[in-house]
UniProtKB/Swiss-Prot annotation:
Organism the protein comes from: Ciona savignyi (Pacific transparent sea squirt)
InterPro entries to which the protein is assigned, alphabetical: Actin, Actin/actin-like_CS, Actin_CS, ATPase_NBD
Record flagged with keyword ATP-binding: yes
Cellular component aspect of the GO annotation: cytoplasm; cytoskeleton
UniProtKB keywords: ATP-binding, Cytoplasm, Cytoskeleton, Hydrolase, Muscle protein, Nucleotide-binding
Protein name in UniProt: Actin, muscle
Alphabetical list of SMART domains matching this protein: ACTIN
Any coiled-coil regions, as ranges: none
Source superkingdom: Eukaryota
Protein task: Actins are highly conserved proteins that are involved in various types of cell motility and are ubiquitously expressed in all eukaryotic cells.
Pfam families: Actin (PF00022)
Amino acid sequence: MSDSEEDQTALVCDNGSGLVKSGFAGDDAPRAVFPSIVGRPRHQGVMVGMGQKDSYVGDEAQSKRGILTLKYPIEHGIITNWDDMEKIWHHTFYNELRVAPEEHPTLLTEAPLNPKANREKMTQIMFETFNVPAMYVAIQAVLSLYASGRTTGIVMDAGDGVSHNVPIYEGYALPHAIARLDLAGRDLTDYLMKILTERGYSFVTTAEREIVRDIKEKLCYVALDFEQEMATAASSTSLEKSYELPDGQVITIGNERFRCPETLFQPSFIGMESAGIHETTYNSIMKCDIDIRKDLYANNVLSGGTTMYPGIADRMQKEITALAPSTMKIKIIAPPERKYSVWIGGSILASLSTFQQMWITKQEYDEAGPSIVHRKCF
């Protein structure tokens, strides 16, 4: 892309609870992917002239985590700390993408069923702090469906902070049937910390949590039959894997590998009185009109980083088949790039010629204020 073309290109920023994915509309993958973390020093600086900053964002916070306290400004998909969120957006525009936000329309994403105030405040910061010429807020799961090349289906989107089932028919999300589950990657990381502690390995600090997250991403998988897998793990060492910690110590994990993500199907493991993701998917389909259920069963799209566990698609297929009518054709679609499918869908949407009239412009914002977002983005 030449500079002249990149002038007016829209920016797409998928602000996840765990990772920020950002880049230019029309690209096939995000340019910048970094943790949604703001870190502040735990101790007073002693080295004079080291130019210590009072806060670090993203990868830099991650690499200096040993001396920092790490905070995630987005919890369960909702922005809870606006000052830190502003730092993350600033870092995205100026350090990662190296663009002037006042020159680019910007597409942001949010979780379904988010509080209205959250969306208004996002709009306000974009126009007033970053002076963007235009912006739009899209629902994450809808973008994932676009990325899979469909306009009808039910998306099971599970990220780091929130999971949800969103049935979509001909491009419209059906709000009455959306199921939201505040159980996602971060809870699984916490649970893995807990069960590793039971094994005698201690992980406590915010920095150590990041190590456990890495163990989870590298070694965990979903069992097709949990009870049988537990029996196998108890009777042999075939399921054991070892992991080297940053200090060189090697730890071995066995049944924790599949006990951790099993929580998605049995939230009671972490004391939640909720249905598992297979049941929420089924319940969500059952809340839809009887005529469209067949299309939803045949188009179960998985998206988000927490659906990256090996074995999850087969397990979903098995569980939903058990719940659905016996003659129903059930298909689980798990695209290999599903970690980024929300961003990819945003990139597709923002580059459509038909979408260009959908942007909220600076002028519209100045006339109507932040509430314009509810009228133009649905």
